[in-house]
Design a protein with these regions (language model features):
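Helical segment within the ABC ATPase nucleotide-binding domain
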Residues: 165-177
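Catalytic Walker B motif of ABC-type/P-loop ATPase nucleotide-binding domains
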Residues: 151-155
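Hydrophobic anchor residue at the start of the ABC signature
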Residues: 140-141
Length: 243
């Protein structure tokens, strides 16, 4: 599906039966760009993704946030857990969406994607035989297999060690380049490395953060990147409210 407009908007308020979570927020999310929302745990990052995806949130929420994404747009969701079916081999996990929809399986496309993520040689193995980083690459291939309009990422790299995380971040960015991505994270460095647009949650609002002029994926040795990382870290520290 071709997306003709340049952005979609997310605006409104959200409250639980106990407190207000967001108050009159407004954010424009650009198509074909990587947008990141950063914030402390419990600030509603994942809830925003659910609203964007037109998912029903718990009835304990009073929600008047509207996302003006067309209802016909399709979404992929990549979570911090790989969510692979343990009894199904890697190839079948990549084709899971087609299986559930009872569509004709595109085995060649699935194998091609496994080759892109460097896992063609384990296509017929079970997930239990793979490392955490390899499993997340399978999840990446499965996300690409769906070829949806908008990719929503809920802290997808948070369970990985530093070296594995760096490698998969770079691979993910290369494969998702020029796609519409909305990611939530609590990692300032990750946000600066990958994002075209960046917002942080503070005082029930979403505020934009200026990023270095260089384009992602940015070099970790860049002085501008390190300065931005320190700046965002301080923002998060100042907005932190102990539970």
């Amino acid at each position: 599906m071709t997306i003709n407009t340049s952005f979609f908007s997310l605006q409104g308020s959200l409250e639980t039966d106990k407190e207000e979570l967001f108050s009159n927020i407004k954010i424009n999310i650009k198509y074909n760009k990587w947008t990141t929302i950063i914030g402390q745990s419990g600030t509603g990052k994942s809830t925003l993704l659910k609203i964007i995806a037109n998912l029903n949130i718990a009835n304990t929420f009073l929600n008047n946030i509207s996302a003006d994404t067309n209802k016909n747009y399709s979404f992929s969701w990549m979570a911090q857990n790989d969510l692979l079916l343990p009894w199904s081999n890697i190839l079948n996990n990549v084709m899971l969406g087609q299986k559930l929809r009872r569509e004709k399986l595109d085995v060649n496309r699935a194998l091609n994607l496994l080759e892109k993520v460097g896992l063609l040689n384990v296509a017929y193995q079970l997930p239990s035989t793979l490392s955490g980083g390899m499993r997340q690459r399978v999840a990446l291939a499965r996300t690409l297999m769906e070829n949806n309009d908008i990719i929503l990422m809920d802290e997808p790299f948070s369970s990985l060690d530093s070296i594995t995380k760096s490698k998969i971040q770079e691979l993910t960015w290369k494969l998702f380049k020029n796609k519409t991505v909305v990611m939530v994270t609590h990692d300032p460095l990750e946000a600066v490395l990958l994002s075209n647009e960046l917002f942080y949650i503070t005082n029930k609002q979403l505020k934009p953060i200026k990023l270095p002029e260089s384009k992602p994926i940015r070099k970790i040795t860049s002085s501008n990147l390190l300065h931005s990382h320190e700046y965002i870290l301080n923002l998060l520290k100042n907005s932190y409210i102990p539970s």
